[in-house]
Amino acid sequence: MNILGGEEVKGVILAAGYGSRMGEKPKGLLKIAGREILYRTIKNLEKNGIKEFIIVTNERYLQKFEEFVKENNLQNVKLAVNRFPEKGNGYSLYVAKDFVKGKFVLVMSDHIYEEKFYELALRGEGLIVDRNPKFVDIDEATKVKIENDRVVDIGKEIPSWDGVDTGFFILDDSIFSVIEDILKEKEVVELKDVVKRARLKVSYVDGLYWMDVDTPGDLKKARKLIVYSSVKGVGDGFISRYINRKISTRISALLVDHITPNKLTIVTFLFGIFSGLMNLISVPLAAILYQISSIFDGVDGEIARARMQTSKFGGFFDSILDRYVDFTYLLTLAYVTIREPIWWVIAGIAIFSSAMVSYSTERFRGAYCADAYKVVPALRKIPGKRDERIFVTMIFALLGLIKPLFALLAAWSTLRVIITIYLVWRDVNG
């Protein structure tokens, strides 16, 4: 069952335009952050219950779309050909007439939307309008004049307007009768003509990330926005939110088209091990490199989410390698700075309990098949996450306060594990 009232709703994607400003490649097949725009659209609609898709293209681009469907094993996608694309995008919609019955979703092939947009838009009806567009060029946007929640005028140059057309529609097959009426009057049918003639109902999704990709500049902008919206959020500590992510997202935007998440995880791991071994040469330099490795540690996850390549193995792999990095860094730090047996005991407790902080949340995932930070929100407010511990470690190491650092880590990490156990007992099993 999907959120459109339990109906089996299909998705229609218009991709029959030539998009001359972007060269010979169809705009929907342009890759942004490692994935085609169309792939993003299809997969996000699938997440929200849309199971079958019709892509309307033209004869020139048909082979390219056939290759796209085959390469991505999209068995739920059918291709329809508009042999007269010069008749307008309204006519392209009409080409889909024989493929849909009842309610269906209509989107443009060159539009991208954040995940939350899909969730809200699919609860609406008619044309989805944004009254607070933050990411589109208003001069180029199609504006909409609305009265009583229905479209009364639409176009780029209308004198007054209430919102912007997002290129996302929830329609039913009665729209084809409207197109047929217009075809009796003229040969070229634009979608705006259909919307205005039908006086489509309007639903609102305001202020969320969406945009259409018309120029190379739009591609660059879209890549950055996709990466910035791919930050994990839940489970991030204070340092990640206010320092690390501001740097890591910029790195991710540069790398997202060029490297896979798992390869980057390995590179980050090797850099982290290197930071630990640098303690044998320079403790201050090693501390700085350790903090840099913490920043890099967020990049693989951001790229995985931006490229739509998240996997259980990726998270599992990254978590294990993080433990090796932390163990190597703290062990080598202790090796070059500590001589007294009692402080080796304290350092051992610090190393073990630091690993247990991460293990406690990962073990929760294994036991309850859920994210501890989502099920027990109070955990988000407790300091001591990996990013916070690494940042504090850097500060103490730069100040030469190694023994106080190990004492702090031993007490801090142990206390956080105890609090985690208590909160899980209280909120989950209490």
From Swiss-Prot:
Residues covered by region (MobA-like NTP transferase): 8-230
Broad class of where this protein is predominantly found: membrane
Pfam families: CDP-OH_P_transf, NTP_transf_3
Record-level GO BP terms: phospholipid biosynthetic process
Binding site for Mg(2+): E119
Positions of transmembrane segments: 269-289, 341-361, 390-410
EC number, UniProt record: 2.7.7.74, 2.7.8.34
Localization: Membrane
Entry GO CC: membrane
Residues at which CTP binds: L14, A15, A16, K27, E119
Presence of keyword Nuclease: no
Lineage top rank: taxon: Archaea
Reaction catalyzed: 1D-myo-inositol 3-phosphate + CTP + H(+) = CDP-1L-myo-inositol + diphosphate; CDP-1L-myo-inositol + 1D-myo-inositol 3-phosphate = bis(1L-myo-inositol) 3,1'-phosphate 1-phosphate + CMP + H(+)
Segments of this protein annotated with the region CDP-alcohol phosphatidyltransferases: 231-428
CC cofactor: Mg(2+)
Topology class, membrane: Multi-pass membrane protein
SUPFAM superfamilies reported in the protein's UniProt record: Nucleotide-diphospho-sugar transferases (SSF53448)
Swiss-Prot/TrEMBL keywords: Magnesium, Membrane, Metal-binding, Multifunctional enzyme, Transferase, Transmembrane, Transmembrane helix
Gene Ontology MF term list: metal ion binding; nucleotidyltransferase activity; phosphotransferase activity, for other substituted phosphate groups
Family: In the N-terminal section; belongs to the MobA family.
Stated role: Involved in biosynthesis of di-myo-inositol phosphate (DIP), a widespread organic solute in microorganisms adapted to hot environments. Catalyzes the condensation of CTP and L-myo-inositol-1-phosphate into CDP-L-myo-inositol, as well as the biosynthesis of di-myo-inositol-1,3'-phosphate-1'-phosphate (DIPP) from CDP-L-myo-inositol and L-myo-inositol-1-phosphate.
Name used for this protein in its record: Bifunctional IPC transferase and DIPP synthase
